Amino acid sequence: FVLPFAAIACGFVYFSTPSTPLFRDGSIMKAVSGTLKQLRKTISMVDEFPGLGRFLVGRIFYTDSANTATAFAAIYVSEEFGMTTADIAKYMLIGILSSIVSGFLWGYLVDIVGPKITLNLVLWIWFATFSLLISTVWLGLPAWLIWGAPFLAGIALGGTWCADRPYMLVLTPPRYIGQFYGLYSMVGRFATIIGPLSWAIIVDELGLGRPAA
């Protein structure tokens, strides 16, 4: 895996090099300073709007869990249940198809009951999914039960995509939509980083195993 990642890094350097002369002396630092100043201002405004801060903090955790589950699903079922490459392909296909189909249903549900109730229901489905993945290993349950996990995870992913952004839109005042959606996006990127990092620490450094991660 080292070579592909190294190639991607070199690609970033190569394609960004032509734009480097466009920056005058000090302009980069000025841009970074301005961005950090605006970020601090945006964060300080979060408490002015009820529920927004709690939602963004919560989003770190459920986005972290969802990203990590999808990123390491193939490794988990391969190492813990000995699935073959063909089995893993079928396993992932179940998740993809269930997320596509359920997405339409979640969209209708958001329109009917609102994004908050829908998102809470989605989080319970995520809880059921992770409980199934963990208990199948720790409690020695029949291995065939694991095939229900991609179905549930796909449904939960579809619901997350359908309810997450609309709920943010409900919590955000119209005049600050662009500003707070930048913070919303940053929270998602942060979760994308800490998810795999947490997995590596729990599995490799602490040796607690994949179910614990």
Which positions does each model-derived feature cover?
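Juxtamembrane intracellular "pre-TM" segments in multi-pass secondary transporters
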Residues: S19-V57
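C-terminal ends and interior cores of transmembrane alpha-helices
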Residues: W124-L141
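Intracellular juxtamembrane helix-capping segments at the cytosolic ends
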Residues: G159-P173
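Loop-to-transmembrane helix entry/capping segments in MFS-fold secondary transporters
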Residues: T85-A86, P174-Y184
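Cytoplasmic membrane-interface "Motif A"-like loop-to-helix N-cap segments
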Residues: I112-I125
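A membrane-interface helix-boundary motif in multi-pass transporters
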Residues: F1-P4, I201-A213
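Helix-to-loop junctions at the C-terminal end of transmembrane segments
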Residues: V101-P115, V203
